[in-house]
UniProtKB/Swiss-Prot annotation:
Binding site for Mg(2+): 47, 185
Binding site for GTP: 40-47, 179-185, 204-208, 273-276, 329
Complex and partners: G proteins are composed of 3 units; alpha, beta and gamma. The alpha chain contains the guanine nucleotide binding site.
Region (G4 motif): 269-276
Protein name, per record: Guanine nucleotide-binding protein G(o) subunit alpha
Lipidation (S-palmitoyl cysteine): 3
Gene: SCGOA
Region (G1 motif): 35-48
Keyword Metal-binding: yes
Xref: Pfam families: G-alpha (PF00503)
Gene Ontology terms, MF aspect: G protein-coupled receptor binding; G-protein beta/gamma-subunit complex binding; GTP binding; GTPase activity; metal ion binding
Length: 357
């Protein structure tokens, strides 16, 4: 008689099965909702990754988007040239054509545009001619070659090498132009998209020190963190503190994130970004500027492996794996390939976390 189930027991068992089924369904749904946090110091390429998600997963930029980026391209280009011109006096670099008064007049034309706050306007013929003469001046080129000694946008050469196209009357930004633009992220940018039957919410938060206090409320229920590091910034200092090396700042920030109690069970993906710029820079600027104990060769492979090891060494948890990728955020194919691999890791880890893998 002890083997028979009462109606009440049967109902309880059925309720239990229903609850388990519902929990499993909820778990599967939870595993499909992916919350990604993009973290990293300022100018590490986070906002470019967000733009790539728009290109790869949301059909790219509309003609309206393109129009809105026009003034940003103009401003980035002029501001870059002005940064070089101003650095020439700081670094005591003379113009190559120093005897010619015209070159100093050209510099004044460009500086006056900034003073009048007209840097978002299309280039006048006079301004375009002045910018072209300045950019080809040997002194300006020498100063550009020392850009690690002052603050200059990574996109400076990209835009200044293409002044004729940017200065044409029918100019409209290309996808690559938009990827190269730089606008400081303030606050939090949120992007939603679907991929591999998953619903992604990607959060890009400002990387400058003043912006980091805004991160905290994004921390809850994060599936994974993508931490961006600009490999090419090993010989540069911060905008906000010119006594601090940018890569050392990134290492300190990564240490804080990687070992933070909020992220004990959070997947951490490390993007060693700007590999294209790093590959060029490492040929002429020593890694010992940042890591004075480095004794390896000045080759991309050895130097990149050393940088990766420095970041991985910050991980104090034997059970936490850091998933590392070397990236070029302005290369859509590279980011598409890397994000595909990242998504597979997220799927496996998320299902495991829900007890479904």
């Amino acid at each position: 008689m002890g083997c028979t189930m009462s109606a009440e027991d049967r109902a309880a068992a059925e309720r239990s099965r229903d609850i388990e089924k519902k929990l499993k369904e909820d778990g599967i749904q939870a595993a499909k909702d992916i919350k990604l946090l993009l973290l990293g110091a300022g100018e590490s390429g986070k906002s470019t990754i967000v733009k790539q998600m728009k290109i790869i997963h949301e059909g790219g930029f509309t003609s309206e988007d393109n129009k809105q980026y026009k003034p940003v391209v103009y401003s980035n280009t002029i501001q870059s040239l002005v940064a070089i011109v101003r650095a020439m006096s700081t670094l005591n670099i003379p113009y190559g054509d120093n005897e010619r008064e015209e070159i100093k007049s050209d510099a004044k034309i460009v500086l006056d545009v900034i003073a009048r706050m007209e840097d978002t306007e299309p280039f006048s013929e006079e301004l375009l001619a002045a910018m072209k003469r300045l950019w080809t001046d040997t002194g300006v080129q020498e100063c550009f070659g020392r850009s690690n000694e002052y603050q200059l946008n990574d996109s400076a050469k990209y835009f200044l090498d293409d002044l004729d196209r940017l200065g044409s009357k029918d100019y409209m930004p290309t996808e690559q132009d938009i990827l190269r633009t730089r606008v400081k992220t303030t606050g939090i940018v949120e992007v939603h998209f679907s991929f591999k039957n998953l619903n992604f919410k990607l959060f890009d938060v400002g990387g400058q020190r003043s912006e980091r206090k805004k991160w905290i409320h994004c921390f809850e229920d994060v599936t994974a963190i993508i931490f961006c590091v600009a490999m090419s910034e090993y010989d540069q200092v911060l905008h906000e503190d010119e006594t601090t090396n940018r890569m050392q700042e990134s290492l300190k920030l990564f240490d804080n994130i990687c070992n933070n109690k909020w992220f004990t069970d959070t997947s951490i993906i490390l993007f060693l970004n700007k590999k294209d710029l790093f590959e060029e820079k490492i040929k002429k600027s020593s890694l010992t500027i940042c890591f004075n104990e480095y004794t390896g060769n000045q080759t991309y492979e050895e130097a990149a492996a050393y940088i990766q090891a420095q970041f991985e060494a910050k991980n104090k948890s034997s059970s936490k794996e850091i998933y590392c990728h070397q990236t070029c955020a302005t290369d859509t194919n590279n980011i598409q390939f890397v994000f595909d691999a990242v998504t597979d890791v997220i799927i496996a880890n998320n299902l495991r976390g829900c007890g479904l893998y």
